[in-house]
Amino acid sequence: MKTLKLLSSSLLICFLLSSCGTSFYDQYSFTETLETKANALSLVEVSDQEYQQHKVAAQALINKIDMMVSYEKAKSKNEITIQMWQYLQSDASSIQQFLDLWETQGTLS
């Protein structure tokens, strides 16, 4: 009886501890986050040129952010990262506002 009680207690503790964890480290997410940052900074660097020359790269950045939102939603225990990507996807984010301003004005100095 003691063995059964000990076993059930151990299983309960293991279950509780495993349910409190966070998402595992994901090399793909890390790499894509760094690449997205580099792409955004590259666009900032060339924003003194006509937007139309870099429209494809700007759209690729938006598509990458959209893809990362979908990718992160597919992982469990990942709410904070999902919120981060969703913010970057929203019109309130500085990157979206930057791209809109650049497109509207043509060039930024």
Predicted regions and their residues:
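C-terminal motif of bacterial Sec signal peptides marking the signal peptidase cleavage site
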Residues: 16-19
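Bacterial signal peptide processing site
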Residues: 21-23
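Surface-exposed, polar helix/loop patches in the mature regions of secreted/periplasmic/lumenal proteins
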Residues: 83-109
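Bacterial N-terminal signal peptides that target proteins for export
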Residues: 1-11
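Alpha-helical segments in soluble extracytoplasmic regions
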Residues: 46-87
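N-terminal non-cleavable signal-anchor helices
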Residues: 13-14, 45
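Post-signal peptide N-terminal segment of mature Sec-exported envelope proteins
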Residues: 25-50, 57
